[in-house]
Structures are given as C-alpha cells and as structure tokens.
C-alpha cells in the first residue's frame, strides 16, 4: 500500500519502468508463534510499469539470488496465477460470486488441511460436490515436475478462456526464468492461492523444508496503484520476511562463525581511571576503521580484563600502559595464539583489519 500511494503521487516524475527495493518494519494482527510476529522486518522488491512476464522472471531471480547468497540451496519458489485459480473454481462448479471467499479458504490448505478447507468452503456457501471438486483441482503437485503439472492444469482448464491465458502466462515466466538462478527452483503449484484479493496475475511463495509457512511471497497487482491514481498501472513485487529467514538460518547453523559468535573484534582495556578518555578515543578510532570494539569500563587488573575478553570471544586486546603511551603505541595481544606486538596507534586500525 505505501508503495502504491507513492507511485500514484509521483507517477509523472518516475521513469516509465520503475524498480525499487526497501527493508522496513511492518505490523500485522497475527498470533505470535515460531517465525510469526506482530512486528517484523520485510524486505521488498517491486517493479512498476510493465505487464511483461519478463518482470516476474526478474523479480523471482532477485529473490533467488538473495537466498542463494545467504546459503539456501533447497528452497522452492511456488508459482501459480489468479486466473488459473478462478478457472479451476469454474471447472469445479463454484459460482463466480463465491470465488474470492473460496480463495481465502483454499489459501489455508497448508495450515488446516483438506478437511478444514472443505468445511470452510461449505460454510462460505460452496456446495459439497463443488467443494470436493475444487479440492481435487487444487491438489498440491509436490511430487510432479512442471511439465506434468502443466498437463494436468491444461486438461482441467480446457475451455476456460481466462484460465488458459493464465496458464500461458505461467509458461512464459518459466521460460524466461530458465536463464536465471530461479529457474531450477520454480515449481508450478495449483494449491498456491495467497488470499489477498489485490493480486491480479502470477503469484509466488518461497518455501523451505521443515518450515510451517513461507519465507516470503508476492505476485502481480496491476490494479492497486489505480486505487489511488485512477489510472491502471501494472506492478509486480515480492516480499521476504527477515525474521523467518533468520530463524531458519539459526536452526540450520548457516551463520558464518564471525556472525554466529557475538564477541568483539577488539577489547580495549582500561589501564587506570585517568586513562578512561584515552581508551574511549582509541575505541572510537578503531570503530571508524570498521572494527567491532568493546571498551572494558573499569580499571580492574589487566589479568581480569584479559579473562573477560576471552570469555566474550574477543579476537584481540589492546593495552596502553605508561610505556606504550609514551611511544604513541598500543600493546596488542591476539588471544587465540597469545602473540603480542607493539603497534603505533596511528597504524592500529589498518593493522587489525588486515588480520581479521
């Protein structure tokens, strides 16, 4: 919604094909549980201005590139289309007036199962036979390849004009994606519904094994900007949930050691109370050099400060005693090896960075 308002307001000043990414906190009325939060960070990528299937392929490629860079290899980008969904509902005998309500129910298939979805479809006014036929049409094709799913959908959608057009659009997206990193991860999935009614075309969702829910999702929303501008503006986007990604990476041990271990690169010791300003200034300069630095805040014995540094997982410790101060230098100890060297303070940041 915020992006749609911005595009509507500045449409005349934006390029014809406008792309953007954004990482920001969002809030939703959700029940907190593993991987689900009321406040969370969302990573968005959107492309405005074209109805071409090139856009979907590029959006999926961007998401795939990010996940691969983070170390994911077993993710699946589930792909479907709103017109395919409506065509399947038509073929099952669900009247058009109930399509939106039916899609909200079908979007819960992963969470409540077939029996739960069927019961909700009936509650929403879909007949028993039509509900059963819809569930059969929306059966997940997790064990089938894209060609087999395509064949099944083509058979079900025969004679459904918009549904056939939607399937053809999915074929174009798959074809365009073969030259991207997303190509080997995209799977046609008739069970993917995404209940948000503003989607108008292709929809997608990222799944990984052993995670209830998804790492993110998105789709084409060609009418959303028009709600604010009064003009039709094609758009497509994808959102990744940062916290969910972090949960999975943590459980799988995917973080590199320098990230998984929270210790500082350097612990700056405090020689005595009179040297507090000197230690703070040294820490400031080392942080400016791009180092993670912690200052020991009390003038305890150096042995105690070294013990603390070791417990914190610090890589190096700096000690500026009276002799070092007179030379404009610092004694640097590498905790893993015990090696010590005296380094000019002016060179210290670069010297440490070269050894991290």
Which ranges hold each PLM region?
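Short, surface-exposed recognition loops or helix-turn segments adjacent to catalytic cores
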Residues: 74-85, 102, 187-193
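Acidic, His- and aromatic-enriched active-site or binding-groove loops in soluble protein domains
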Residues: 94-115
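Short, surface-exposed, charged loop/turn segments at secondary-structure junctions
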Residues: 92-94, 204
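Hydrophobic mid-domain F-helix/FG-region of cytochrome P450s
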Residues: 62-68, 83-91
């Amino acid at each position: 919604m915020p992006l749609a308002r911005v595009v509507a307001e500045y449409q005349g000043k934006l390029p014809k094909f406008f792309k953007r990414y954004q990482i920001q906190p969002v809030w939703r009325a959700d029940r907190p549980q593993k991987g689900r939060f009321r406040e969370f960070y969302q990573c968005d990528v959107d492309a405005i201005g074209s109805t071409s299937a090139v856009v979907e392929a590029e959006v999926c490629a961007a998401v795939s590139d990010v996940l691969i860079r983070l170390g994911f290899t077993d993710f699946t980008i589930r792909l479907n289309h709103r017109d395919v969904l409506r065509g399947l509902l038509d073929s099952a005998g669900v009247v058009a007036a109930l399509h939106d309500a039916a899609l909200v129910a079908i979007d819960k298939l992963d969470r409540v199962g077939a029996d739960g979805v069927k019961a909700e479809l009936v509650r929403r006014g879909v007949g028993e036979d039509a509900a059963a036929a819809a569930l059969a049409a929306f059966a997940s094709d997790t064990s089938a390849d894209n060609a087999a799913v395509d064949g099944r959908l083509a058979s079900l959608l025969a004679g459904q004009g918009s549904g056939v057009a939607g399937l053809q659009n999915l074929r174009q997206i798959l074809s365009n994606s073969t030259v991207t990193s997303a190509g080997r991860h995209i799977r046609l999935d008739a069970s993917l519904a995404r209940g948000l009614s503003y989607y108008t075309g292709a929809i997608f969702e990222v799944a990984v094994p052993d995670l209830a829910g998804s790492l993110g999702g998105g789709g084409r929303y060609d009418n959303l900007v028009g709600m604010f501008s009064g003009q039709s503006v094609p758009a497509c986007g994808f959102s990744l949930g940062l916290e969910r990604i972090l949960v999975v990476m943590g459980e799988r041990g995917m973080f590199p050691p320098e990230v998984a271990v929270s210790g500082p690169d350097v612990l700056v010791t405090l020689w005595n109370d009179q040297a507090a300003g000197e230690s703070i200034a040294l820490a400031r300069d080392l942080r400016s050099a791009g180092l993670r630095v912690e200052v020991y805040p009390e003038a305890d014995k150096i042995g105690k400060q070294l013990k603390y540094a070791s417990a914190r997982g610090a890589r190096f410790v700096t000690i500026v005693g009276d002799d070092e101060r007179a030379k404009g230098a610092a004694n640097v100890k590498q905790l893993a090896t015990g090696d010590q060297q005296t380094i000019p303070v002016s060179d210290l940041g670069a010297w440490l960075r070269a050894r991290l």
